[in-house]
């Protein structure tokens, strides 16, 4: 994925450049200041991407296989897994093609490589935007299920969920296409950062409200029978805790990426910012790690999904 015209790793491979910096690697700091740069080997990118790819394929397969998981919430989870799958797949594809070009094992014209780079950029950006949107959709779905429990099934219906999913994918593709077309405009980068922050604020507000309700629930039923207390407390706390974990992981894994975009706008030539830019390999690795962690959370915290995953694995053998 690119943010500046010189940051075209695939095209750079045609010129047999020795640099091993993938994707968004910026120019080296020209001031001579010492910078901490974390080197991420291409093999690690491929390994992380492969693990994420397998995990997310299993999640999507399990949800598609089990009709009990065809609820709106699991539809959003399935789409989030699909977004993670696209993130991993696009990074694996770019890394693999780059290695082949650098080794001379793949011959391609510059125009073909540029088109491939554009496609990979659109896929990566689309999956990023859709991940944000689906995390927000999951948060809203859980919020409605807790605060409007009696009306939940009339508010969040499967047809509405499908329309929301379709709208998210269409909007993500259109916005990512515009982003790639106008990547050199600061306003485009700022829009992405603002969107990221807005979604984080929205989800954080919902999570805090849900946690507050869960705490009130626990206090109100503390004097009741233990089984009743666990039944009431488990529904609110488990859902809120799951979403809070998801938000925290997403922020830690994606935060550096959006910090990178912000600094490109605010201080593209500053020595300190240049040092941060040189660690974009690490930021990409964190994004792929997020795609690895998400399926683990779903599999271990959902008994129905975990059971279906076991059936899928047993059938594959």
UniProtKB/Swiss-Prot annotation:
Lipidation (S-palmitoyl cysteine): 315
Parts of the chain that traverse the membrane: 38-63, 73-93, 119-140, 164-183, 192-211, 241-266, 280-300
GO cellular component: plasma membrane
This protein's UniProt keywords: Cell membrane, G-protein coupled receptor, Glycoprotein, Lipoprotein, Membrane, Palmitate, Receptor, Transducer, Transmembrane, Transmembrane helix
Location within or outside the cell: Cell membrane
Positions annotated as glycosylated: 29
PROSITE patterns (alphabetical): G_PROTEIN_RECEP_F1_1, G_PROTEIN_RECEP_F1_2
Keyword Ribosomal protein set for record: no
Membrane topology of this protein: Multi-pass membrane protein
Signal sequence bounds: none
Residues on Cytoplasmic side: 64-72, 141-163, 212-240, 301-317
One MF annotation (Gene Ontology) recorded for this entry: melanocyte-stimulating hormone receptor activity
Residues in the Extracellular compartment per record: 1-37, 94-118, 184-191, 267-279
Example GO BP: adenylate cyclase-activating G protein-coupled receptor signaling pathway
Superkingdom field: Eukaryota
Keyword Membrane carried by entry: yes
Family per similarity comment: Belongs to the G-protein coupled receptor 1 family.
Physiological role: Receptor for MSH (alpha, beta and gamma) and ACTH. The activity of this receptor is mediated by G proteins which activate adenylate cyclase. Mediates melanogenesis, the production of eumelanin (black/brown) and phaeomelanin (red/yellow), via regulation of cAMP signaling in melanocytes.
Assembly behavior: Interacts with MGRN1, but does not undergo MGRN1-mediated ubiquitination; this interaction competes with GNAS-binding and thus inhibits agonist-induced cAMP production. Interacts with OPN3; the interaction results in a decrease in MC1R-mediated cAMP signaling and ultimately a decrease in melanin production in melanocytes.
Protein name per its UniProtKB record: Melanocyte-stimulating hormone receptor
Species the sequence originates in: Macaca nigra
Chain's gene name: MC1R
